[in-house]
């Protein structure tokens, strides 16, 4: 009798647990994308030993630790690729790697990097600064915020370090707008974008940097240099206050800015992460160099995601990488009982389209699943992937080849403990759109 009672009790308990999970699950309120998605996670037999096989290959940037993440990259004038990342999840000493062969292999990075980089508290972002006087050499700039991590104290503000010799040497970090300044901020992901500005239709030596804070206020600050070449940043100001209701509902953050006409035009497009995941990424436009922005609209499902990074390709198209966030019916059908938040991720995704697609609200041409990012104890590629990926370093080589780097769990056999936790590494992939165009066309002709 006691045995029967125990069985019934256990059955009731199990039912209660699963019923509770089902009741707590948020609904999938988004839509599905309808453009093709090219899956480069597994090499099909028909492309083995062909000119397309490279599209399915990954190069290891760094797998020397159990967890490395959040890379950013810049193309050097000699064709080398410099990639930077923190030694940890979102923070830690800045580490670097350099590829001298177009992303095929990665070797040692910067020698004798600044000692202040050891105390970096966030994901570093790196940009090239092209001056307009025809005399001043390009600078490279690394920026790293000082956010608040849990109970750890922070002085806030953001740090920047400058190189005027193509990354061989760097200044020590200089901090701007910490808690002791007249305009204190505690930024997150500074700068998620850095855009050279125009005045009277011509580029000037001013750059607009964007970041957000823990309350999802979004800020801009303008970078200039004094006559001695020292960086100055204007006092951060909120640039989206006019749309505070939707900014807050979306938990808008990690904004990428894209300039029209292959980076030469007069219109700016903003695309953001919606951290609430209860609405899609937001898109907004500015025709006055970021002084004002149009009413934000939700991006098409094909572009919905987090930490968008955009580059123009040699043929004028846009290649935008991001962490996929899927909120539609297909996502709901593929979700497991553990996916209770109204979304799932396909992992590391790239979108191929045009600036006009962004303006017109089109879905674009196609998406690319660049590799499968495994969940712990997931043994083979699946529609649902690990969402801990998608912060990318993207460069376009002179021959048009795209080299994109991200982080994630790429190998289901690379376990770091007995319970099946997988190693998180940084890898890169080479992409040529003329080749992915062919594969997508083959998909359409052979559904």
What feature does the model see in each segment?
Residues 9-16:
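Bacterial N-terminal signal peptides
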Residues 26-447:
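Asp-box/BNR beta-propeller blade signature and adjacent active/binding-site loops
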Residues 17-28:
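Sec-dependent signal peptide cleavage junction
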Residues 1-7:
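Positively charged n-region of N-terminal signal peptides that target proteins for export
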């Amino acid at each position: 009798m006691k045995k029967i009672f125990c069985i019934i009790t256990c059955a009731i308990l199990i039912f209660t647990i699963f019923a509770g999970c089902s009741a707590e699950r948020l609904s999938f309120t988004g839509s599905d994308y309808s453009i093709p998605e090219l899956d480069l996670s597994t090499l099909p037999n028909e492309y083995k030993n062909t000119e397309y096989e490279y599209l399915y290959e990954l190069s290891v940037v760094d797998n020397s630790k159990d967890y490395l993440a959040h890379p950013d990259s810049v193309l050097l004038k000699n064709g080398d690729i410099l990639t930077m990342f923190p030694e940890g999840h979102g923070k830690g000493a800045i580490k670097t790697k350099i590829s001298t062969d177009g992303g095929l292999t990665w070797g040692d990075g910067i020698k004798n990097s600044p000692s202040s980089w050891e105390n970096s508290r966030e994901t570093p972002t790196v940009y090239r600064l092209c001056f307009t006087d025809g005399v001043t050499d390009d600078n490279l700039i690394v920026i790293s915020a000082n956010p608040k991590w849990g109970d750890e104290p922070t002085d806030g503000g953001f740090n920047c370090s400058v190189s005027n010799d193509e990354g061989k040497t760097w200044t020590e970090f200089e901090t701007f707008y910490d808690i002791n300044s007249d305009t204190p901020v505690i930024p997150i992901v500074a700068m998620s974008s850095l855009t050279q500005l125009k005045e009277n239709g011509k580029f000037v030596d001013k750059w607009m940097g964007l970041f957000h804070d823990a309350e999802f206020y979004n800020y801009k600050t303008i970078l200039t240099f004094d006559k001695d070449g020292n960086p100055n940043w204007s006092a951060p100001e909120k640039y989206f206050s006019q749309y505070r209701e939707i900014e807050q509902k979306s938990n808008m953050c990690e904004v990428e800015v894209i300039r029209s006409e292959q980076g030469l035009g007069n219109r700016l497009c903003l695309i953001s992460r919606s951290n609430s995941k209860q609405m899609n990424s937001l898109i907004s436009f500015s025709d006055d160099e970021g002084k004002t922005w149009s009413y934000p609209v939700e991006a098409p499902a094909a572009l919905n995601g987090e930490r968008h990074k955009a580059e123009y390709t040699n043929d004028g198209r846009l290649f935008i990488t991001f962490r996929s966030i899927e909120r539609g019916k297909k996502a709901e059908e593929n979700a497991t009982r553990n996916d209770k938040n109204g979304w799932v991720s396909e992992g590391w995704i790239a979108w191929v389209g045009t600036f006009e697609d962004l303006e017109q609200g089109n879905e674009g041409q196609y998406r690319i699943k660049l590799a499968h990012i495994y969940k712990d104890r997931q043994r083979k590629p699946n529609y649902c992937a690990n969402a801990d990926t998608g912060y990318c370093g993207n460069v376009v080589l002179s021959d048009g080849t795209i080299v994109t780097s991200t982080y994630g769990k790429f190998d289901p056999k690379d376990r770091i403990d007995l319970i099946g936790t997988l190693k998180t590494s940084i890898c890169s992939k080479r992409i040529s759109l003329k080749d992915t165009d062919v594969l997508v066309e083959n998909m359409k002709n052979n559904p």
